[in-house]
UniProtKB/Swiss-Prot annotation:
Gene3D superfamilies: 3.40.50.2020. One of its GO terms (biological process) is pyrimidine nucleobase biosynthetic process. The keyword Magnesium applies. Orotate binds at S126. Keywords: Glycosyltransferase, Magnesium, Pyrimidine biosynthesis, Transferase. Belongs to the purine/pyrimidine phosphoribosyltransferase family. PyrE subfamily. It comes from Cytophaga hutchinsonii (strain ATCC 33406 / DSM 1761 / CIP 103989 / NBRC 15051 / NCIMB 9469 / D465). It catalyses: orotidine 5'-phosphate + diphosphate = orotate + 5-phospho-alpha-D-ribose 1-diphosphate. This is Orotate phosphoribosyltransferase. HAMAP family: PyrE. Its EC number is 2.4.2.10.
Length: 209
């Protein structure tokens, strides 16, 4: 199966991805964006959820066959990680953005053995900053990180640089280029909007400021 294409189409169909080149969204980072991606919506659609489950499992079996444990990145990576771990009959843990301020004050939740080989699961990759913080926490906890998988990446150069500098490989089911290709082919956006969509991807921080 061509997961790159099918996942892009599924995200468009269920409106997990919305494209508004003329009416940009405002991200939490302050960036203006012609695209908004909420992969949490895939959990509400069994067909999409199962497609993503099968695709992520395939990524692990293809690229990280030595995987011994799944680690979800809070919060959106947790349900995806749980679904994969259940499908593969593997243990699972998850990583908080910061330690709890009560109880055991855990940053990593779950119980596995130090030194185990882990694949980290994210739902969406933008700059990679928060994802790589989770990786760093796991490495400091004594675990071996095989790599990271995710549903979708915007394909920013800064993300590619961040993962390269961290020495972490990343594999996602779909990406911005494929999504825009399918969006045009299926009339979610018009051909004359492609230039705007391309300009944003090249310089997202300064687009339409």
């Amino acid at each position: 199966m061509n997961y790159t294409k099918e996942v892009a189409l599924s995200l468009l169909k269920i409106e997990a991805v919305r494209l508004r080149p003329e009416e940009p969204f405002k991200w939490a980072s302050g960036w203006n964006s012609p695209i908004y991606c909420d992969n949490r919506l895939t959990l509400s659609f069994p067909e999409s959820r199962n497609l993503i489950r099968d695709g992520l499992v395939d990524l692990i079996r293809t690229h990280y066959p030595a995987c011994e444990c799944i680690a979800g990145v809070a919060t959106a990576g947790i349900p995806q990680g749980a679904i994969i771990a259940d499908s593969m009959n593997l243990p699972m843990i998850y990583v908080r953005p910061k330690p709890k301020d009560h109880g055991m004050q855990n940053l990593i939740e779950g119980k596995i053995t130090k030194g185990q080989k882990i694949v980290v699961v994210e739902d969406l990759i933008s700059t990679g900053g928060s994802s790589l913080k989770a990786v760093e926490a796991l490495q400091e906890g004594g675990f071996e990180i095989l790599g990271m998988i995710g549903i979708f990446t915007y394909g920013f150069q800064i993300a590619e640089d961040n993962f390269k500098n961290a020495g972490i490989t990343l594999h996602t089911l779909s990406n911005y280029d494929e999504l825009i290709k399918e969006a045009v082919a299926n009339n979610y956006v018009k051909q004359d909007q492609l230039q705007t969509l391309g300009e944003w991807r090249k310089n997202p921080g300064d687009w339409k400021k």
